[in-house]
From Swiss-Prot:
This is Carbamoyl phosphate synthase arginine-specific large chain, chloroplastic. It catalyses: hydrogencarbonate + L-glutamine + 2 ATP + H2O = carbamoyl phosphate + L-glutamate + 2 ADP + phosphate + 2 H(+). Keywords: Amino-acid biosynthesis, Arginine biosynthesis, ATP-binding, Chloroplast, Ligase, Magnesium, Manganese, Metal-binding, Nucleotide-binding, Plastid, Pyrimidine biosynthesis, Repeat, Transferase, Transit peptide. Expressed in roots and leaves. Residues 645-1040 are annotated as: Carbamoyl phosphate synthetic domain. Pfam families: CPSase_L_D2, CPSase_L_D3, MGS. Signal peptide: none annotated. Gene3D superfamilies: 3.40.50.20, ATP-grasp fold, A domain, ATP-grasp fold, B domain, Carbamoyl-phosphate synthetase, large subunit oligomerisation domain, Methylglyoxal synthase-like domain. Residues 1042-1183 form the MGS-like domain. One of its GO terms (molecular function) is metal ion binding.
Length: 1187
């Protein structure tokens, strides 16, 4: 059994040793004597009794509190009685009266609702099917494991509206509805279905959370009253349903700032912090519009208070357990999804933790969540310990996924089983196989989660953090101390940091005013501002006063700065084995040490290994090593004992995609999971390495072994050295593992490690790193295309500003410019003249020989095509799917709607595409997946835009459109199977039409323009399937949240380049009964064509103008394309923002407008018909092909 005590022994720390061994590491040089203080986790004397957070028996001395919480909080006995009446024994235990259960998914990935609900939904489907229930699933997101046809018995990939869900209920007749696995989307749907009478009409029971409990937790007024009933405090507040009511509440509270929280919304959408009356009015308007019940809570600000969360579970026998405590490093005022969080809570005494635990149990009982998981959020005053209850989520949440991965306790799986009658003591713990789920998890490590942001994708928006969530992803890391897990989590973000500090960061060049502002005002880079402030000599007390980040955390961070300073004061050769162990125990990466000692990462690694300083791997076991863990879920540390125990089976290491970001999201995790499933079926042990807590890939039972580690070359090579797998797969995780392909290959070529199975050397499976580089290196790729006689747009590689201007002059404007080696169109732009090109080169990118910029002719008015193809190691190539984009070329493929099969492309063009794709796959020696993008001009010329010999974000969509799991096939061909073995030898062209539409987070980023371009900005996608394109497109728009009007007024404002299409667009909407209004130039064009149109003023032409019509509800659909004129650009931007604020559908491309007209025509002529995925094609059982 491992030692629970994480306190470092002074005997093993040479930094504490006498100056005789190494004078540079003398204690006398420390800034204070507590340099290497103990972790916040202490030895627990009664682990069986305590929960994950109850181990903190000693209160950190640096906390600025006048007293303990004891005198402030009521004893448990003083809480109002919330015990429930005993449950009747006949309903405790698995229910046999239920046969069919419907699960509501979460829909597309949006900010505030991401992969974690695929994780929870997948767990729920598996858990219920294990128990023999028939599962019906509704979800519009194709990039999910839960929507695979084998996950549920009946799968509907369709819009999630009350009317369409009711249609499925009528058709499938489920006995029960489980709404707690799909986030806010599912909860709101369940409430709507219950209140409309649909559930009662068809005899459907809500399980997991009853209607009363959902409303009591989600309705701000009911929740406030409930807390009052049990004697718990909430911030002084009031409920407003109109703007006047909101101002009345503000008057009563009496001071700014004020927090505005809309009811029944996701990720704080529509809410915020108001510091004055103008901001208050704006946020209240937004919140009232965003709330499903037009209700907002206006409450006193608790800015600067500490924030904690507890994950709670309750069963039908009224057993309640606390799964995990979570502490936000950022104080109140920052949405918990945007805060750096730590589990278990680090700055609570045991007594304080027990109080919050008691409150959580009282709350879940008062709200009435009979069974399942809930998340409770607390605010604690750092001065006197006063506690306020912030909110409660009566469902599986983002924090639930984090708590599940942090503890190994599968909250969603347990919640699903509890919903059908099981009690916690009746469900075994999968990890220990000896303890029941009623044992509260105990953990002997620290977990840190850090959010990832994408403000650079939304120019014009302010990079500030408030109560409205804005992060697009997150990383998580585990370590034996906070310092270790924090540094690992930071380098897991893949934002250019190898840890905290030991790097050239912009904040070091800031003056004191800039630094103080960044410390005071929450922003994505505040943690780096803390580093810069400490480096510049700012004291902990001052940083605390500015940031309100707890002094315990600041003390821990200051120690890291001191370690960095020690490293910088000497050379690598001076560092002893003991010194290196102490530095690595604090999470410092080889790259950080190299920076500090002015050496290279490879030199540090060589020295470290020569000294025998290698990581050990610990198991996540839910019980702090009290019982053996049977599931190999590992994290690295520089502790003594290694618990990994690798074996000599045939095995494959799969590198995941890391944290979600725009351009690399759930689609790549989907591919990684399918790879693992397929190779397990083929008899391989699969090993997953990833750092994203939201995903299915990091579920402990997705692969045979899981390493929760950063995706850096250091951490990956450490696992390779330990496991020595037969193969390493880099093709499925997006750009993250691809960047590691060449360094891994160089390492394998140099050291030639042999696999533990004895089958030969460790090697990268699939397409070679050299072929990947050939496709991404522009000069090599151009040479290949010239050899194969494949056409591409005219262009060149610019290594200076002069090069770029010369290429643009040669090919002619407009041109597309972008840096090489990017994903998601990062820093890609269309420019129309020299001045804009110069501006781009000065502001967006650095151009030099080391960082060339690609300059290509922009093919305006061309149609873009996406092709996913599959190639085996025998040279056989099969087209997986050819997708036609609805938006013209120039809009990033990830942001464009697309359809499969193609609808308007001539057969000759399709044949050219098939021929070129096949030739290229063979030339690059592709083994696995490849994605190619083409453009077809109006004259029928075909051009190849780019090729990526890896899995693309369209693979899940294509797989579900054609009924073949392409990622599984790709994994199997890498293992040596042929496409003939898999019975996949020719392109499948389905009879039905599938449409994929992108979903955008514009409402979260006020001030940014919603117009689409070559830089990807969508966070997720939806899919629909129908017999005709028009109905499939309409369904996709509804699923994406676009409420298409069936009548009313259409506003048109088109630039000169798109006016040739204007007549067709206007006639299409007139024939549907719409009225047309247009700005002067557009109206003049239509009048010349004899088309009835009403003129409306542009914003700079006077009042009433187009924005007034939007505000007055006189415009129901808008088409605005951007022109080069500065005033028109400003007007168009403001109108598009106005449309977003008033929820008016806005279209920014001609093709999108024409498709929308077709979709509206379909909606007016016939009702949407819901069809299960299993009715379109037979479910493919890949394992049967391997027999």
């Amino acid at each position: 059994m491992r030692n629970h005590c994480l306190e470092l022994s002074s005997n093993c720390s040479s930094i504490f040793a006498s100056s005789k061994s190494n004078p540079r590491f003398s204690p006398s040089k420390l800034s204070y004597s507590t340099f290497f203080s103990r972790s916040a986790i202490y030895y627990r004397s009664k682990p069986k009794q305590a929960s994950s957070s109850s181990s903190f028996s000693t209160f950190p001395p640096c906390l600025n509190r006048k007293s303990s919480l004891t005198h402030v909080l009521k004893p448990v006995s003083e809480l109002a009685d919330t015990t429930t009446k005993p449950f009747s024994p006949e309903i405790v235990g698995k229910r046999t009266d239920l046969k069919k259960i419907m699960i509501l998914g979460a829909g597309p990935i949006v900010i505030g609702q991401a992969c974690e609900f695929d994780y929870s939904g997948t767990q729920a489907c598996k858990a219920l099917r294990e128990e023999g229930y028939e599962v019906i699933l509704i979800n519009s997101n194709p990039a999910t494991i839960m929507t695979d046809p084998e996950t549920a018995n009946r799968t509907y990939i369709a819009p999630m509206t009350p009317e369409l869900v009711e249609q499925v209920i009528e058709k499938e007749r489920p006995d029960a509805l489980l709404p707690t696995m799909g986030g806010q989307t599912a909860l709101n749907l369940a409430v709507a279905l219950a209140e409309s009478g649909a559930l009662e009409k068809y005899g459907v029971e809500l399980i997991g959370a009853k209607l009363g409990a959902i409303k009591k937790a989600e309705d701000r007024e009911l929740f406030k009253d409930a807390m009052k009933n049990i004697g718990l405090k909430t911030p002084p507040s009031g409920i407003g349903t109109t703007l006047d009511e909101c101002f009345d509440i503000a008057e009563k509270i009496g001071e700014f700032p004020l927090i505005i929280r809309p009811a029944f919304t996701l990720g704080g959408t529509g809410g915020g912090i108001a510091y004055n009356k103008e901001e208050f009015e704006s946020i209240c308007k937004s919140g009232l519009a965003a709330s499903a019940t037009s209700q907002v809570l206006v409450e006193k600000s608790l800015l600067g208070w500490k924030e904690y969360e507890l994950e709670v579970m309750r069963d039908l026998a009224d057993n309640v357990v606390i799964i995990c405590s979570i502490e936000n490093i950022d104080p109140m005022g920052v949405h918990t999804g945007d805060s750096i969080t730590v589990a278990p809570a680090q700055t609570l005494t045991d007594r304080e933790y027990q109080r919050l635990r008691d409150y959580s149990i009282a709350i879940i009982r008062e709200i009435g969540v009979e069974c399942g998981g809930s998340n409770v959020q607390f605010a604690v005053n750092p001065v006197d310990g006063e506690v306020m209850i912030i909110e409660m989520n009566p469902r599986v949440s983002r924090s639930s996924a984090l708590a599940s991965k942090a503890t190994g306790f599968p909250i969603a799986k347990m919640a699903a089983k509890l919903s059908v009658g099981y009690t916690l003591d009746q469900i075994p713990n999968d990890i220990t196989r000896k303890t029941p789920a009623s044992f509260e998890p105990s953990i002997d490590y620290v977990v840190t989660k850090i959010p990832r942001f994408a403000f650079e994708k939304f120019p014009g928006s302010q990079p500030l953090l408030t109560t409205q969530m804005k992060s697009v992803g997150e990383s998580m890391a585990l370590g034996r101390t906070f310092q270790e897990s924090f540094q690992k989590a930071l380098r897991s973000l893949e934002c250019g940091f190898s840890g905290w500090g030991c790097a050239k960061i912009k904040e070091l060049d800031w003056d004191w005013d800039q630094l103080k502002y960044s410390l005071r005002v929450p922003n994505p880079d505040r943690i780096h501002a803390i580093y810069a402030a400490m480096k510049k000599g700012m004291k902990i007390d001052e940083i605390y006063e500015l940031s309100m980040v707890d002094k315990w955390f600041l003390t821990q961070l200051k120690e890291l700065v001191d370690v960095e300073q020690y490293l910088m004061s000497g050379t690598l050769s001076e560092i002893t084995k003991e010194d290196l162990y102490e530095v690595k125990k604090r999470g410092f990466s080889d790259k950080q040490i190299a920076f500090a000692t002015k050496t290279t990462e490879e030199e540090v690694r060589t020295k470290r290994i020569s000294l025998g300083v290698v990581p050990s791997y610990k198991r996540v076991d839910t019980c702090a090593a009290e019982f053996e863990a049977h599931t190999p879920y590992m994290y690295s540390s520089y502790d003594v004992e290694c618990e990994s125990a690798p074996n000599n089976k045939k095995k494959v290491l799969i590198l995941g995609g890391g944290p979600n970001r725009i351009g690399q999201g759930i689609e790549f995790d989907y591919c990684c999971c399918h790879t693992s499933f397929a190779l397990q079926d083929a008899g391989y042990e699969t090993i997953m390495l990833n750092s994203n807590p939201e995903t299915v890939s990091t579920d402990y039972d997705t692969s045979d072994r899981l390493y929760f580690e950063p995706l850096t070359i250091e951490d990956v090579l450490n696992v390779i050295d330990l496991e020595k797998p037969d193969g390493i797969i880099v093709q499925f995780g997006g750009q993250t593992p691809l960047k590691l392909a060449l360094p891994i290959k160089h390492y394998l070529d140099k050291h030639m490690p042999m696999s533990l199975s004895g089958a030969g050397p460790v090697r990268i499976w699939g397409t070679s790193p050299d072929s990947i580089d050939a496709a991404e290196d522009r000069e090599r790729f151009n040479a290949i295309l010239d050899e194969l006689k494949i056409e591409q747009p005219k262009g060149g590689i610019a290594k200076s500003e002069a090069d770029a201007l010369a290429i643009a002059k040669e090919v002619g404007y407009p041109v597309v410019v972008r840096p090489s080696y990017v994903l998601g169109g990062r820093a890609m732009e269309i420019v129309y003249d020299d001045s804009r090109l110069i501006t781009y080169l000065e502001n967006a990118v650095q151009v030099d020989p080391e960082r060339p910029v690609l300059v290509d002719k922009y093919l305006s008015d061309a149609i873009e095509i996406d092709v996913d193809t599959l190639t085996d190691s025998y040279g056989n190539v099969v087209i997986g799917g050819i997708m036609e984009h609805i938006e013209q070329a120039g809009v990033h493929s990830g942001d464009s709607a697309c359809m499969l099969p193609t609808q308007t492309i001539p057969a000759s063009c399709l044949q050219t595409i098939r021929t070129w794709t096949t030739k290229l796959a063979k030339k690059l020696n592709v083994c696995g997946l490849m994605n190619c993008q083409y453009a077809i001009t109006t004259s029928g010329d075909v051009f190849l835009l780019e090729a990526n010999p890896r899995a693309s974000r369209t693979v899940p969509f294509v797989s579900k459109a054609i009924g073949h799991p392409l990622a599984k096939y790709a994994a199997l061909v890498m293992s040596g199977k042929s496409l003939k073995d898999l019975n996949f030898e020719k392109e499948v062209i389905p009879k039905h039409v599938s449409v994929k539409e992108a979903v955008f987070p514009f409402e979260k980023f006020q001030g940014c323009d919603v117009i689409l371009g070559p830089e990807m900005r969508s966070t997720g996608e939806v899919m629909s399937i129908s017999s005709e394109f028009s109905s499939a497109f309409a369904m996709a728009q509804i699923a994406a949240g676009q409420k298409l009007p069936l009548s009313g007024t259409v506003f048109l404002s088109l630039n000169d380049m798109t006016k040739p299409h204007l007549e067709k667009i206007a006639v299409s909407f007139l024939e549907l009964g719409f009225k047309i209004v247009a700005t002067s130039g557009t109206a003049h064009f239509l009048e010349l064509k004899g088309i009835p149109v009403e003129r409306v003023l542009k914003l700079h032409e006077g009042r009433p103008h187009a924005a007034d019509m939007v505000a007055n509800g006189q415009i129901h659909l808008m088409l605005i394309t951007s022109s080069g004129d500065a005033l028109d650009q400003k007007d168009g931007r403001q109108l598009r923002q106005m449309a977003l604020a008033y929820k008016v559908p806005v279209i920014t491309t001609v093709a999108g407008a024409l498709a929308t007209a077709e979709g509206i025509k379909s909606l007016k002529s016939s009702a949407i018909k819901m069809t299960a995925l299993q009715d379109f094609f037979e479910v493919k059982n890949v394992s049967s092909l391997l027999v």
